[in-house]
């Protein structure tokens, strides 16, 4: 349980921090997608209904003793009992059941950090098909913008001469294309001044900018 992590699926002996952060690689115990839910082979599962940071200590401090710390004024817990499939069924009855992803998403994805140009994308696709490797997705990571890692949702005009045609060509070869995106904008990003001016960024509890970068507020009707 507890969401995406590069650590072992069995959490016994681990201390897990459930808070969205950039893990800076798989060598840390931080995570992009924490989920405040876990199951035990002792026949129970627990969902922590909070958006606050949570720490679950599964015997890391004291063997055989589970502890939980929640940064919230209220403790709102749901406890489920039964077989794992029954626990998952009850949990998803509560929070919602996921839809089945398309079949191609379970196929092979080809990527690295990072393909910087249209030519690289074409070359990778050609080599895959030439060598008859099964592949469904080509993923362009952090380098498809003008400045690496600074997402502005626009292909670099210097390195991607005709991205629309590239997408069509790759589709005709049987590839889906995935583009790395992140809704944060550094002060050097061309959209940063506009987001500040239009008040379209996520604020902290004091109504202030919590970090140097801004995170796009998708709840803003504008």
Enumerate the language-model features and the residues they cover.
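Aromatic-lined carbohydrate-binding/catalytic grooves of carbohydrate-active enzymes
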Residues: 99-222
